Amino acid sequence: MKLSGISLWLLAASIVHAGKSQFEAFENEFYFKDHLGTISVYHEPYFNGPTTSFPESCAIKQVHLLQRHGSRNPTGDDTATDVSSAQYIDIFQNKLLNGSIPVNFSYPENPLYFVKHWTPVIKAENADQLSSSGRIELFDLGRQVFERYYELFDTDVYDINTAAQERVVDSAEWFSYGMFGDDMQNKTNFIVLPEDDSAGANSLAMYYSCPVYEDNNIDENTTEAAHTSWRNVFLKPIANRLNKYFDSGYNLTVSDVRSLYYICVYEIALRDNSDFCSLFTPSEFLNFEYDSDLDYAYWGGPASEWASTLGGAYVNNLANNLRKGVNNASDRKVFLAFTHDSQIIPVEAALGFFPDITPEHPLPTDKNIFTYSLKTSSFVPFAGNLITELFLCSDNKYYVRHLVNQQVYPLTDCGYGPSGASDGLCELSAYLNSSVRVNSTSNGIANFNSQCQAHSTNVTVYY
């Protein structure tokens, strides 16, 4: 049938005024801030899982929080050899300002023209420190956790287990102020665990409390080789593309490219915006994200033989406290621990979160495969967390559920919740005895002590 001109016009008009939902996929915007690896600002992951509401006909009985510190300044490095360190970035910034790295300000629409009037916010003297936004993140999270689990807060004082680094302790304090306000000092008992081998299996910095792993630099060479391979693939094309924005005769090195990127991401962490980020394309941000993911996959993560050892002690402690809750062997209901991203990933690996990445099948280092489980941007952004919930449901059975950054991480290896549907829950005994985690839930502490030749300790902590 041949349509008249007026019919075509009416058809076009009706399409314009119709709902757009069927074509929204073509209009999705790329949010680069959600893809900055472990330096990402806090955001919820993209699990598309069940609702975070408490399951119907279930009562919350325990909550366990494993919490990363909030947004921070770059870490310190007195030798200024680490490209991501505050000292290295500070030196690079000065080179941009004094012309040692010569921006071509006469190049039309140079995205670096702002450098003429730019005042750096990254300072070497602030290395390692929690940022103001990091304090706000933790305060707000503390408030939200208290409101969500209010019925469990029925004792006078709560243990706050924290790794010893200042930014972690500060984060724990701000979180506690969010929970208890001015009454924080009276409501908390801070247990500060050293970040060295004296903490043994109680550590919240397992890399440093495992002498065999730390002293022998296990995973260091394989991780560096993975980075070298991948950076040889993706960094040089960025340097070639950006060279035109600098005076002729100056060619960016791959370290220069990484420095520009780190200024971008840390300015985002410190003040939520950065003109340097306009230098990079969406694909390039995803490739930097992959570089971060390689780090946490190979260094104590699921691509390492040591992941279940390093994460298993926490998992065993968690499992023991879940069992005590069921057996009425303890009246503790709230378990709080504050740590680093490098602690959380091995724990999640020991829990079976990354089944597609193994020592036998690690992430490739010659290409970005995009569809893989361990996205550090989603699992351990600044202020990232892992929450474990224990429920007693109307069928008189106990169930477990995990939340990652306040979104349900659906458990698929141990059955279903009381609804009989895939709702992210597992019945407790099935959860503890699932083949993906039973070695950690049952033997994690013993494995850590024996394989690490860890120091014994008389301190008892509860995660």
Curated annotation (Swiss-Prot):
EC number(s) reported in the record: 3.1.3.2
Cellular component terms (Gene Ontology): cell wall-bounded periplasmic space; extracellular region; fungal-type cell wall
UniProt KW keywords: Cell wall, Glycoprotein, Hydrolase, Secreted, Signal
The glycosylation sites annotated in the UniProt record are N98, N104, N186, N221, N251, N328, N433, N439, N458
User: Which GO molecular function annotation, any one, does this entry have?
Assistant: phosphatase activity
A UniProt-annotated Pfam family? His_Phos_2
Similarity field: Belongs to the histidine acid phosphatase family.
In Swiss-Prot or TrEMBL terms, this protein is called: Thiamine-repressible acid phosphatase pho4
- Gene name on record? pho4
